[in-house]
């Protein structure tokens, strides 16, 4: 539940008109961004594949996490169906995602439902986040919350954040930070609850927070308190998860999938494009050398590669090891007016080597899109073309 950052970065929800500008506490970055960045840092550190955000609201956290390359399944759950439908499109792939596909598949799904209902589609997750959620639960739902999230879903890691009520006296005219909050806990109250839940469901927990207090008020602690729960022994095995009976109580209101290199058609597009660009770069770099040969022609292959790998001021920067690998690979050559680039040469370039494991794989993917030599060992291109004459290479 992100706070609006209006006249300052105050965390006081809905009370901006009551907070004098000169006395309002400012957080830079705004507190909601600090919370989301905290989660993102955890994702960067632990690299979970399956992540769910319970009480996802306007999907701000999901939009931040979707760019992380390790995540393959991203789920949001919220009780407000209209908000999910309104914000769903912001999670869809953009044109740039098709031009530069991810390495791994990514599916994003938004579910309408209550966080205290059991849905088997959220079993087996690596990380579940509950950011500023539990304070919105009434006593009955709060009692059921651990049973569902810790007991039934039982992910590897759970992150729960909630307001620290000890910080509230630093805000003018504030008792609860949001009119929908059912409670706000002190650090002792939150930690007592968290330790009890962790012990009952076999988790360990550590405490931290975001939103540092102003000088002289360090004793109140962070404005937002955070508990990080780790499942002892890791998450449930796939076999255990599959034994659970299917329970689909949530309503899927939005789902989308991102293009990735795991999908054959996108992998081919990327590889063909990378090969074409590298061949063109090599061809253009050798045109001046070719002109120095005074128009000499013949069927005998001419090694025009030189001893050094070409380095463009606008191109990638290679390490010494990468340069050596390129220099030691088979060099481009000419036969008549044709320019040949061995596949082994292309595989020496880091970007292409990352895409293709070997020559046979590269040949099988590009063969019907890029001209190859008769033995299939090299890409063939015209040495000169119309544009070379126009731009006087």
What residue ranges belong to the model's regions?
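Class I SAM-dependent transferase core
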Residues: 2-31
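S-adenosyl-L-methionine-dependent methyltransferase catalytic module, highlighting the catalytic core
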Residues: 4-15, 60, 79-125, 129, ...
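Conserved alpha-helix/loop element of class I SAM-dependent methyltransferases that forms part
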Residues: 30-49, 64
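Conserved class I S-adenosyl-L-methionine
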Residues: 48-57
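Conserved SAM-binding loop of SAM-dependent methyltransferases across substrates and taxa
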Residues: 58-70
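Conserved SAM-binding motif I beta-strand of class I
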Residues: 73-78
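Phospho-regulated, low-complexity intrinsically disordered regions of nuclear gene-regulatory
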Residues: 387-393
């Amino acid at each position: 539940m992100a706070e609006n950052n209006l006249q300052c970065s105050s965390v006081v929800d809905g009370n901006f008109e009551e907070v004098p500008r000169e006395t309002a506490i400012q957080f830079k970055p705004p507190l909601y961004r600090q919370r989301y960045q905290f989660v993102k840092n955890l994702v960067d550190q632990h690299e979970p594949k399956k992540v769910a955000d319970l009480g996802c609201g306007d999907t701000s956290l999901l939009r931040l996490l979707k760019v992380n390359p390790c995540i393959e399944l991203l789920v949001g759950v919220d009780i407000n169906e209209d908000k999910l439908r309104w914000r769903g499109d912001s999670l869809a792939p953009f044109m740039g995602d098709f031009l530069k596909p991810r390495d791994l598949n990514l599916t994003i799904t938004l579910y309408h439902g209550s966080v205290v209902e059991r849905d088997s589609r959220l079993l087996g997750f690596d990380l579940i986040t509950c950011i500023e959620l539990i304070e919105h639960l009434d006593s009955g739902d709060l009692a059921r919350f651990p049973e569902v999230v810790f007991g039934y879903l039982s992910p590897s890691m759970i992150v729960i954040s909630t307001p620290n009520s000890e910080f509230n006296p630093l805000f003018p005219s504030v008792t609860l930070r949001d009119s929908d909050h059912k409670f706000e806990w002190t650090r002792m109250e939150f930690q007592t609850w968290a330790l009890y839940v962790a012990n009952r469901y076999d988790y360990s927990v550590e405490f931290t927070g975001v939103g540092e207090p102003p000088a002289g008020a360090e004793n109140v602690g962070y404005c937002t308190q955070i508990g990080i729960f780790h499942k002892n022994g890791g998450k449930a095995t796939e076999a255990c998860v599959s034994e659970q009976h299917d329970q689909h109580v949530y309503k899927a209101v939005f789902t989308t999938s991102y293009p990735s290199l795991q999908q054959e058609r996108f992998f081919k597009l990327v590889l063909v494009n990378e090969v074409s660009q590298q061949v063109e770069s090599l061809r253009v770099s050798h045109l001046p050398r070719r002109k120095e040969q005074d128009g000499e022609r013949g069927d005998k292959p001419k090694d025009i590669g030189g001893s050094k790998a070409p380095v463009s001021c606008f191109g990638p920067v290679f390490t010494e090891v990468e340069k050596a690998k390129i220099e030691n690979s088979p060099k481009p050559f000419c036969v008549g007016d044709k320019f040949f680039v061995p596949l082994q040469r292309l595989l020496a370039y880091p970007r292409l080597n990352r895409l293709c494991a070997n020559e046979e794989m590269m040949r099988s993917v590009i063969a019907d899109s890029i001209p190859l030599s008769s033995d299939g060992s090299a890409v063939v291109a015209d040495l000169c073309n119309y544009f070379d004459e126009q731009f006087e290479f």
